[in-house]
Amino acid sequence: MLDVKRNLTTMTDFYELTMSAGYLDEGYKDKIAVFDMFFRKVPDGGGYAIMAGLEQFINAVDSLEFTEEDINYLRSTGAFNEQFLDYLRNFKLHCNIWAIEEGMPIFPQEPIVTVEGPAIECQLLETLLLVTFNHQCLIATKANRIVRSAAGRPVMEFGARRAQGYDAAYFGARASYIGGCGSTSCVMAARDFGIPASGTMAHSWVQMFPTEYDAFKKYAEMYPDACVLLVDTYNVLRHGVPDAIKVFDEVLKPMGKRPKGIRIDSGDIAYLSKKARKMLDEAGYPDCTICASNSLDEYIVRDLILQGARVDSFGIGENMITAKSDPVFGGVYKLAAVREDDGSYTPKMKLSESAEKMTIPCLKKVWRIYDQDGKAMADLITMADEVVETQHGITLFDPIETWKECTYVNCTARCLSTPIYENGKRVYSSPSLDDIKKFCKAQVNTLWDEVKRFENPHRYYVDLSQKLWDTRSALLKKLSK
């Protein structure tokens, strides 16, 4: 079981430790900082991403502890003094952490996780936080694209063997399920996360027997209630489908059973599925489904459907489990504010030649604005102490092209920044994975179809409150001098 409370404390970049040692030496042990995780672009040029990975991050945070083995290793590097090693030995989390809940559509620039606490603690969480959310957000986003392309047809996650390591296969299956997949081929993920397991046979099963018919016959005898036959080992139309029909007639029919389906894993799937459908129907098996696999992605799935392919479900492997077409999520973790001794916050931001790469300072919240029909219209980032009131409507403006304004009436605002930890104590109860999946589907349905386009989606606006925009503008002017 990989999803247990394992100690991942040293799953960090070395410079997190060297910086932390410097903070301690400078007297910054209790200096309160605010960091945000956000991302700058949606993978595959999409209109939105899917939040995923919070449960695994929580499990890792709950298990933070520097063991004596860790301390001894760090001592052996020669980079750290005993004062810092003693600090690590007695390490305890005191941070406040907010996050957008799993399954929620998320957008560039908005903080999807915010950490407030002693600077050393914030720094030591960075790598662990990024590796967790960057992976699962990436895979959940890709899975959601593929599931939407299937237009209601079931999508099965088949990617374990092509994943980049055990954790990637295991947690990738979880993220794929959040994104909308109906099952996984990964037995460990199915067992631990309660995801339905799926899978029947490989070509090696067919090749192991004297004939394809013999292989099909044995499988049908063993699994009469779940008989799905792989029909492309030799020739789909000359041998595979005819042999499958023969086994259905000779083995399943006498038992009073019906076949579940056939799977096509190669060739021109649009053409083969049409021919196979005709053969199955004529043989009296209109209820026998056809599953397609073979390096599919959202574009191929969409094209198959547009071409009239008679495919009832899809098995997706490497293109989903690795997000092969755009395999880096690109989430970053940046300092947003530092709390002074008097309790006030000094905003911090990173400058850039590109406006899109300049960070947003201050301790903040993210709000989603919905119209009277429940459709998401825009997101609004505010200072943490602001409350968004919508009784009399709300006017939002583009933070870069400020002359672009839009006023929404009869709308509601939902705060997305959910408390996860308060002073190091967990205050959030995680929903079940099935509930996260349902939540994801419901929230994606609040987006306009134009935002969900695969090519050239409408840009969903993420705006700043007037107070936050003014603060950022003043800081930008000050830092640019």
Question: Language-model features: where?
Answer:
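An N-terminal, globular interaction/scaffold subdomain
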Residues: N59-L64, A99-E102, I106
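Short coil/turn segments at secondary-structure boundaries
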Residues: N72-Y73, T141-R145, G159, K452-R459
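Gly/Ser/Thr/Ala-enriched C-terminal appendages of enzymes
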Residues: M1-K31, R40, D44-G46, D281-A283, ...
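Short hydrophobic alpha-helical runs that function as membrane-insertion/retention elements
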Residues: G199, C291, D312-G315
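Short, positively charged
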Residues: T77-L85, G165, H392-I400
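Short acidic, Pro/Gly- and aromatic-enriched capping/linker segments at domain boundaries
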Residues: I97-G103, A413-L416
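Buried, small/hydrophobic-residue-enriched core segments of structured protein domains
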Residues: M1-A33, K41-P43, A79, L85-H94, ...
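N-terminal, Lys/Arg-enriched amphipathic/low-complexity engagement segments
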Residues: E26, A33-R89
